[in-house]
Amino acid sequence: MKSKTHVSKRALWFFALMIWTLPSQAQDLSPQKQAALDATEALSPEIRKMAMSLWQYSETALREVESAELLADILEEEGFTVERGVAGMPTAFVASYGSGEPVIGILAEYDALPGVGNAAVPQKAPREDGVTSGQGCGHNLFGAASVGAALALKRAMAAQGTGGTIRLYGTPAEETVVGKVYMAKAGLFDDADAVLEWHPGQENKVRNQRGRAMNNFEVEFFGQAAHSSADPWNGRSALDAVELMNYGVNLMREHVMPTTRIHYVIPRAGEAPNVVPEYAKAWYYVRDVDRESVQKWYDWILKIAEGAAMGTRTEHKVFLVTGVHEYNLNRPLQEALQANLEQVGVPAFTEEEQAFAKKLQAYLEIEETGYDTEITPLADEPEPASGGSTDVAEVSYITPTAGFNVTTAAADIPWHSWATSACHGTDAGVKGAIVAAKVLALTGMDLFTDAELLESAQNYFEEQTGGESYQSPLPSDQEPPLPTTSSR
C-alpha cells in the first residue's frame, strides 16, 4: 500500500505539471523550439530532483563539492564534455556539447548562504539534519534549471539536426561575488557568442537593472603588542589604525556621490583588552553605478588606509578580494527573453501553495499576497540601479548577456533569509525553476536558429562597449581566495 501511495503522489505531481505547461504548447512554435520545449517538460522530474538535492546539500561559497559534482556528473552522463576545477576553483566547471558556432552559454549557480537554513515549512524551524546553511538566494533552483535547459537544448539540437555548441558554465561562489570574476579573468567566456542566465525571485520579469560595480577588499594592519597598562608606550596598536581608517572613511562619506555605497566590518580587532593589538583587519565594500567611480573611491580609501598606518606607526597591506563591473544590459536578448517568458507563462501555483506563501507572510507580519503571478512588461529604459552587485556583470562585458527572474518565493519576504530558504525547498519553488528552464531553452534555441537575433545582440554589445576589450578588476596573477576548511 505504501508503494502505491508513493507512485500515486509522483504521478499526480507530474500530471499537474503537464497540465500547467499545456498552454505554452498550444502556441505556434518552430519545430526546433517545440522540440526544446518538449525536452524541457520531459526533464521536469530530473530538474526537481536536482533542485531538491542541491537544497539538501546547501554548500557555501567555494565549498560546493557535492553540488558541483552532482551537476557535472549529470551533464557528463548526457554526453557533455566536462572540464572540472577550472580557473583555480575546485568547484567550478565548464560543460560543452556539440561543435562549431554559435557557442551559446548558460550560467549555473549552486552555492548557499551561511546561517539561513530552515525546514521547508512556513515558519522558522531548523532543518532536521542540522545543516545551518540554506538556499536563501535559490541557487539550488538556479543550478537545476540551467542544467535542465542545457540538457533540453542538447536533446532538441540532436533531434532537429541543429548545429552549434551549447556551453553550461558551473559558476561557484556567487554569494561572495567571486566565481565568475576569476572565470572571466581566466578567459573561459571569451569564445561564447552569447550567454543567458536567470535568477530565482519574487517577480516574473526580464532583468532591466545595471546593478552596481563593486570592490570587495581587506586592509590588514600590523603593529607591536605590549601590556596595555604596564608599558603601552612600547606598543603600536593595529586596532588604532583600523579605527583611524574607519573614521577617515566616515568623514569621506559627505563628499561622495548619492549613488555611492561604502560599508565595512572589523573581523579582527585584537584578543584581549590588556594587550595592545598587534594585528587587526577591516573588510570593506565600495559600490557605485559604474566601474570608473568605484575605482576613484577605492583609490581614495587606500590613501586613507595609508594615512592611518602612518599615524599609528603600523604597517598595512591591502588585498582586493574581488571586483565587478555594473551589468551591461543587452536589449535584443532582453526582448527575446521577454517574448519567451510571455510564451511560457508564470508558474501555476496551487491554492495550497498560495496558502503556504500567505502563512509564511503572516508569520513575518507581511501583507498576505502570496506568490506573484504577473509578468512585468519590459520597460523602454533601464530601471534605476539596484543596491546589489553581481559577478554576472563580468560576463556581460565579454559577450552579449541577459537574464530574467521567475517567482520562486513569496512576495515581500526578506531575501537571503530563512524564509526564502524555506520557499526554495518546496515544489512551488521547483515550478519556478521549470518555467526558467523552458525560457532558457527557448531563447537558447532562438540564438542557435535565428542568425539575425544573434547578430543584433552582438552589434548592440559592440555599441555598448565601444569595441573595448574586457579588463578584469583584479591583478593578473591573483588566485581565487579558496577556503581552508570544508563547511556548510
Task: Identify the residue ranges that each predicted region occupies.
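N-terminal signal peptide c-region/cleavage motif recognized by signal peptidases
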Residues: T21-P23
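Bacterial N-terminal signal peptides that target proteins for export
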Residues: M1-W13
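Histidine/acidic-residue-rich, glycine-tolerant segments that coordinate divalent metal ions
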Residues: K124-G134, N140-L141, M157-P277, R287
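Glycine/charged-rich beta-loop-alpha catalytic/anionic-binding loops adjacent to active sites
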Residues: A120-G136, F222-A226, T376-L378, S417-T426
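Metal-dependent amide/peptide-bond hydrolase catalytic core
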Residues: Q27, E243-R488
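Divalent metal-coordination and catalytic microenvironments
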Residues: L54, L75, A95, I106, ...
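Acidic/His- and Gly-rich active-site-bordering loop/insert found
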Residues: Q27-Q135, A144-T165
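Sec/Tat-exported extracytoplasmic proteins
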Residues: L43-I47, A51, W55-S58, G79, ...
